[in-house]
Regions:
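Structured adenosyl-cofactor binding patch, chiefly the S-adenosyl-L-methionine
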Residues: 114-149
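Extreme N-terminal starter segment of soluble prokaryotic enzymes
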Residues: 1-4
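Amphipathic alpha-helical repeat scaffolds
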Residues: 10-17, 131-133
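Cofactor-binding loop segments of dinucleotide-utilizing enzymes, especially the Rossmann-like FAD-
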Residues: 9, 34, 81
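Short internal beta-strands
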Residues: 28-34
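S-adenosyl-L-methionine/SAH cofactor-binding core of RNA-modifying enzymes
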Residues: 41-107
Length: 149
């Protein structure tokens, strides 16, 4: 099972879509406060549709609280547009943690410094960033492809 981590998500529709993606790929979703919405927000539920009741998810009050749940810090991969290595080059394993930052600014330097593994999604210089839910779909899809082999 993959562990998908959203640190301080801001947009309920993205979180709902990612929740549905996690149900479909049998991944666990980890949400780290603060959020830009309430989990009960109708937009989260609408985007996740009726799948939200099947979602395997956990929430944490802080990054530090979440970090206590990680058995092997070397299997944590932070998604960052500033990373040198593409997620295509990574060898994913069952149980890996794939971490995404907030929609507006990504991951803070403080968080990036806590983990050595940073990955990027290749992107045209004409585009600043991908939508968070789309970025999750890219990376989860590649990780699942590798795990099925």
């Amino acid at each position: 099972m993959l562990n998908i981590v959203l640190i301080e998500p801001e947009i309920p529709n993205n979180t709902g879509n990612i929740g549905r993606l996690c149900v479909g790929t049998e991944s666990r979703l980890h949400l780290i406060h603060p959020f830009g919405f309430q989990i009960t927000d109708k937009n989260v539920k609408r985007s996740g549709l009726d799948y939200w009741v099947h979602l395997d998810w956990k929430e944490y009050q802080s990054v530090e609280e979440w970090m206590t749940q990680i058995p092997d810090l070397s299997r944590v991969f932070l998604m960052s547009s500033h990373a040198q290595k593409s997620y295509y080059e990574n060898q994913f394993q069952d149980g890996d943690w794939i971490v995404f930052g907030k929609e507006s600014v990504g991951l803070s330097q403080e968080i990036l410094q806590k983990f050595p593994n940073h990955l990027k999604i290749p992107i045209s210089p004409l585009v600043r960033s991908y939508n968070l839910a789309n970025a999750c779909a890219f990376v989860i899809g590649e990780a699942k492809r590798q795990l099925i082999k």
